[in-house]
């Protein structure tokens, strides 16, 4: 994958943890395994001139839920030159994180959650829609804080909901969502 990414002109690879649909505890073995994996992948990324974007998944069943845990592992292996974290607004809210790491963030993913019947602990990828006025995840505030902290990288959409994929005019919907986010950020 690293060979293909480098050949395509990509600057990095997003790395997501296991999401096994079962609770993964915070054992010393799990922490050691994360560090071992990051060390091994670091040499592969380095050989291809790529960065590693570590994306904790905020689901309760994820083997890596928190950016803080990812950054501790990155620091423990001396990997800050290769690794940054992905700030995903959906997973940030789902994990119940309050701290953002703008200077350690290499990529931002945004998506909205509008259905008031879905709790943050129960939300799934299938609930992720484009960001709009009914957003419950606080996308605009998260972006505002990231920018205020110095983040100046890429922001990309990650709406996985079927209703988004089935839109008659997806380009228009994406443009409307971009417009909403821009206008909301300008109102700061």
Predicted regions and their residues:
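Alpha-helical packing segments of well-folded alpha/beta enzyme cores
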Residues: 1, 37, 41, 142, ...
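Active-site acidic/histidine proton-transfer and metal-coordination neighborhood
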Residues: 1-84, 169
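Conserved, mostly hydrophobic/aromatic
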Residues: 5, 52, 70, 88, ...
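Active-site beta-loop-alpha junctions enriched in small/polar residues
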Residues: 18-20, 57-59, 88-92, 110-115, ...
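Gly/Pro-rich active-site loop or hairpin
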Residues: 25, 64-67, 91-152, 164-171
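C-terminal helical cap(s) of enzyme catalytic domains, especially alpha/beta-barrels
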Residues: 167-188
């Amino acid at each position: 994958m690293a060979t293909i990414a480098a050949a395509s002109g990509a600057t990095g690879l997003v790395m997501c943890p296991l999401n096994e649909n079962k609770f993964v505890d915070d054992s010393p073995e799990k922490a050691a395994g994360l560090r071992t994996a990051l060390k091994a992948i670091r040499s592969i990324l380095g050989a291809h001139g790529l960065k590693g974007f570590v994306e904790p998944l905020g689901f309760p069943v994820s083997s890596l839920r928190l950016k803080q845990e990812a950054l501790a592992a990155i620091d423990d292996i001396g990997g800050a030159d290769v690794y940054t974290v992905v700030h995903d607004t959906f997973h940030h809210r789902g994990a119940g994180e309050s701290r953002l790491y703008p200077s350690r963030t290499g990529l931002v993913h945004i998506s909205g959650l509008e259905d008031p019947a879905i709790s943050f602990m129960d939300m799934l990828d299938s609930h992720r829609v484009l960001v709009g006025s009914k957003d419950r995840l606080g996308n605009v505030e998260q972006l505002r804080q990231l920018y205020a902290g110095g983040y100046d990288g890429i922001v990309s959409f990650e709406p996985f909901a079927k209703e988004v994929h089935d839109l008659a005019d997806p380009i228009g919907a994406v443009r409307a969502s971009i417009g909403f986010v821009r206008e909301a950020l300008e109102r700061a």
